[in-house]
């Protein structure tokens, strides 16, 4: 639903009110900004509005100044000429001069809307008459509103064909508060004798919706914008009216009053209304008003008294012919409007096809781009494959060259080996007699070797015999050594006893003078000193006697043995003792050498031990350091995990625990063997 407000336009009372709507010279110059800058839908709506204009406004009396100059004269059969431009048609001409944004001043049309040249005229009209531009066929396609985006998102088509009437909703609101025409305070039913004449004039002068001068800017979306309303000084202010889309229920009419003369008659209040249903206007009201009852067509003109409808005279043939011509002209205009709407629909379809073509071109460009990208990828892959094949070919060529070189080298080696084999065969042929000679020599040597083996066996038997003799002698030597060792032990014991006896004897000899001097110094009883002396002498004598007896016995035994052995035994013993002493010295030297070797081995072993211990210490220290580093890393990982996963506060640097380091004593104890 859209709402309209009509504003009154006051005209000069001295002028004809209908001439106020005639185009001024200034109006034909610059284009109407509403038409020039409006949307394409406004132009389409204007074109359809002009095409559906009714012919009711072309009728009127010829006697009064305020009536339209019409083709009805005295009713003679002379050829009727088209009247000049009606005010509404002139206004439509002024508005349609800039239809679709272009001034087509050189185009002229006849009564039926056919386009003629600028100098030529129609056969049924005068040479200077031109049809209003709203009845012409546009030479250029209408400019449609550019819609961005996809076409399938549009809720409504751009141009609706005018051949189909939209469905009228049941709850639509008609246009209200339309003021009746000015009747100078007298109701329409209570007028004077000219009331019927005024009613006929009113029915004949009704204009359809979409008269000239109206402006539509809906662009096919049901909106009404700035519809100017023309009214004379005799019309009243029209209240705001609300209209349903594509329907106009009432059109402002103008009546001519029945006064004295044409100047006293009232002017018509002409209003132009426009709908907002894709620029379509209904012409049924105009056609119905123009096709009124026959009694209306033959009514008198001027200020005569009105007659009832039953007493009206039948219409004249000229009026019927004019009415039929007007109906024919209206139908032709409807056909032209349908043709224009069809062209506009074709333009819309062309635009749709153009947009689809653009979409297809975009898709084709995308497909080309994708195909070009895929072709580039395939080309790159083919190039990489070609490069890989070239590299493989180069490698195979290099391998082939290497194999050829290796084959040539093997051929040279084969030739060299063949030469060596030939030389070896020649040498073998030369060595055959020498080999035979060496075989005979080998046989001779084998005999000699067997003989030598026999001699070796004999010598081995002699050696074994000698060895057995040596073993016997060694056993005898052991026995002699054992007896000599016993003798030496006895001699040593005798020497020890002799030395001890001699020492005791010397001690006794040293004590004897002191003991002898003691009795002389002290007067004693001759019996007591003798007893003490006897006891002392007895003790000393016992000791001396025992020592002397032992020494004498030993000397006697030694002397006896020495004398018994004789000088030969002594010499042999001395030789044996010298030999034994030499063996003992050699044994001592061997023992010293063995001790020195043992000491050297011990020293080397100690050095190796120290080295091993040092290595173990270093290895253990490295293990300990590795363990400490692992503990530090684990602690850092735990701290990082705690800082990232939980919100536990990290310990401060001063509160961190020191890493465990083993002491030197623990290291030494752990490395001891």
From Swiss-Prot:
Residues 79-92, 653-673 have a biased composition (Basic and acidic residues). Pfam families: Fez1. Residues 173-186 have a biased composition (Polar residues). Residues 317-496, 571-639 form a coiled coil. Its main location: other. InterPro entries: LZTS. The modification Phosphoserine is found at residues 316, 318. Residues 258-269, 295-307 have a biased composition (Gly residues). One of its GO terms (biological process) is regulation of dendritic spine morphogenesis. One of its GO terms (cellular component) is synapse. Residues 215-235, 274-294 have a biased composition (Low complexity). It is found in: Synapse; Postsynaptic density; Cell projection, Dendritic spine; Cell projection, Dendrite. Keywords: Cell projection, Coiled coil, Cytoplasm, Cytoskeleton, Phosphoprotein, Synapse. Residues 1-157, 172-239, 251-317, 635-673 are annotated as: Disordered. May be involved in promoting the maturation of dendritic spines, probably via regulating SIPA1L1 levels at the postsynaptic density of synapses. Interacts (via C-terminus) with SHANK3 (via PDZ domain). Interacts (via coiled coil) with SIPA1L1. Can form homooligomers. Belongs to the LZTS3 family. This is Leucine zipper putative tumor suppressor 3. It comes from Homo sapiens (Human). The lineage of its organism: Eukaryota, Metazoa, Chordata, Craniata, Vertebrata.
């Amino acid at each position: 639903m859209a709402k309209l407000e009509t504003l009154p336009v006051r005209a000069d009372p001295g002028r004809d009110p209908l001439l106020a709507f005639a185009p001024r010279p200034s109006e034909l110059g610059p284009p109407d900004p509403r038409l020039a800058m409006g949307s394409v839908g406004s132009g389409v709506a204007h074109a359809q509005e002009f095409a559906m204009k009714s012919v009711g406004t072309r009728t009127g009396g010829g006697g009064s100044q305020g009536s339209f100059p019409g083709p009805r004269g005295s009713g003679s059969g002379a050829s009727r000429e088209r009247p000049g431009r009606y005010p509404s048609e002139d206004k439509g001409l002024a508005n349609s001069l800039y239809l679709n944004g272009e001034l087509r001043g050189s185009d002229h049309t006849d009564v039926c809307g056919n386009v003629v040249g600028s100098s030529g005229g129609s056969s049924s009209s005068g040479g200077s008459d031109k049809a209003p531009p709203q009845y012409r066929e546009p030479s250029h396609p209408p400019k449609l509103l550019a819609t961005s985006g996809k076409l399938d998102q549009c809720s409504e088509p751009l141009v609706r064909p005018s051949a189909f009437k939209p469905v009228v909703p049941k709850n639509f609101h008609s246009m209200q508060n339309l003021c009746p025409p000015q009747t100078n305070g007298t109701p329409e039913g209570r007028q004077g004798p000219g009331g019927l004449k005024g009613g006929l004039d009113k029915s004949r002068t009704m204009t359809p919706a979409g008269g000239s001068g109206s402006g539509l800017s809906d662009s096919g979306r049901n909106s009404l914008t700035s519809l100017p309303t023309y009214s004379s000084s005799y019309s009243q202010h029209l209240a705001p009216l609300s209209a349903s889309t594509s329907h106009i229920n009432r059109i402002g009419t103008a009546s001519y009053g029945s006064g004295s003369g044409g100047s006293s008659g009232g002017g018509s209040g002409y209003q132009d209304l426009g709908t907002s249903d894709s620029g379509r206007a209904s012409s049924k009201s105009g056609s119905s008003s123009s096709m009124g009852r026959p009694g209306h067509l033959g009514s008198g003109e001027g200020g005569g008294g009105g007659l009832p409808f039953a007493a009206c005279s039948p219409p004249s043939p000229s009026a019927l012919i004019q009415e039929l011509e007007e109906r024919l002209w209206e139908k032709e205009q409807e056909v032209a409007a349908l043709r224009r709407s069809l062209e506009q629909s074709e333009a819309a379809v062309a635009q749709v096809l153009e947009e689809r073509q653009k979409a297809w071109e975009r898709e084709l460009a995308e497909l080309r781009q994708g195909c070009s990208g895929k072709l580039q990828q395939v080309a790159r892959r083919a190039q990489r494959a070609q490069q890989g094949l070239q590299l493989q070919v180069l490698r195979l060529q290099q391998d082939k060259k290497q194999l050829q070189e290796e084959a040539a080298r093997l051929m040279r080696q084969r030739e060299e080996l063949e030469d060596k084999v030939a030389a070896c065969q020649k040498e073998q042929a030369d060595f055959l007699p020498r080999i035979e000679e060496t075989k005979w020599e080998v046989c001779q040597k084998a005999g000699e070797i067997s003989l030598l083996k026999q001699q070796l066996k004999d010598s081995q038997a002699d050696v074994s015999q000698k060895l057995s003799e040596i073993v016997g002698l060694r056993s005898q030597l052991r026995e002699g050594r054992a007896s000599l060792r016993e003798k030496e032990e006895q001699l040593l014991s005798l020497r020890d006893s002799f030395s001890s006896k001699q020492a005791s004897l010397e001690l006794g000899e040293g004590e004897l003078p002191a003991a002898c001097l003691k009795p002389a110094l002290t007067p004693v009883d001759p019996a007591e000193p003798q007893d003490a002396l006897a006891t002392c002498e007895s003790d000393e004598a016992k000791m001396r006697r025992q020592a002397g007896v032992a020494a004498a016995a030993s000397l006697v035994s030694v002397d006896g043995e020495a004398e018994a052995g004789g000088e030969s035994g002594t010499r042999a013993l001395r030789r044996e003792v010298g030999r034994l002493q030499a063996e003992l010295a050699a044994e001592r030297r061997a023992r010293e050498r063995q001790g020195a070797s043992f000491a050297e081995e011990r020293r080397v072993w100690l050095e190796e031990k120290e080295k091993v211990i040092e290595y173990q210490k270093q290895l253990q220290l490295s293990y300990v350091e590795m363990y400490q580093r692992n503990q530090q890393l684990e602690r850092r990982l735990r701290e990082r995990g705690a800082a990232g996963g939980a919100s536990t506060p990290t310990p401060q640097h001063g509160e961190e625990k020191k890493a465990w380091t083993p002491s030197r004593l623990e290291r030494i104890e752990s490395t001891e063997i």
